[in-house]
Amino acid sequence: MKTVIRPDIRRKHIYLHQGIVYDRQPLLNGEMRDLHVSLLSPVGHRTKDTNRYPCMVWVCGGAWRGGRERAAEMLPELMFLAEEGVIIAAAEYRIIGEAVFPAQINDVLTAVRFLRTNAEKYHIDPERIGIIGSSAGGHLTLLAANNDGQFDTQAYSNVSSHVKCAVDLYGIADIEAVYQFNLNAIKQGKRPGRSNIPEEFPECMLLGGLPSDDPVRAKQAGGINGICEHTCPVLVMHGSDDHVVSIEQSEMYYHAMTAAGKDVRYYIVDGADHGSDEFFQEETRAVIRDFLNEKL
């Protein structure tokens, strides 16, 4: 059988660019680590394209343990944005055990400045960079959304780490509240399969100790505590049945943003657990897509 077809062009070819080193940082064991960013882009190495595209920096979750091998794991689920002409940049960051807070948000903001510095090379519109993250990545996303400069480093310091908008998927807004939640869960026998030793809670490993050991660091680690005049518009989505990060985190953040007069959209995903399939359906994608069409 021989057939001629003429497809309508409804989407661009999407390219994956990997192994891009954006920084090199020391670890607690004295070694150095290259930090990479992977891109989903409508522009390939041989593509003749002079356009600039908006960019969303993806920050992965995994209890602050996913910023290494798993940094680009969710890129397939973000193809729906790439097909809309949004460059997706999955940024690695130093994980717990490699560095303590604020190294993780330092790295994420360095990645933003790297992309802005190299905007022409990667066909990025430097005025249209946003951030999206889930779980622990949502925590870092909310910190980045404040645009307050307190976590900037000297790398690529000639440009801003400002993000235009942020999408937080079932993330953590208040580290101290998470710690108290987990302590209460121990008393109620609701932490099966997870450590009951406070020093081994992920949030304590992130801080390098209990929140009470360094209250200032613990407070700084909560995006809810840094809401200010520079905080960008934020979309929050959280599952009603989340058993890992309590929906109270997003409730508190929503009320704090509202009280501060900031632009916040809060969607409760009915019946959804932590990172469950409900977050990757067309209905939830449409919410994210519409928000970015308006704010990015």
Predicted stretch roles:
Residues M1-L296:
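Alpha/beta-hydrolase superfamily serine-hydrolase fold, recognizing
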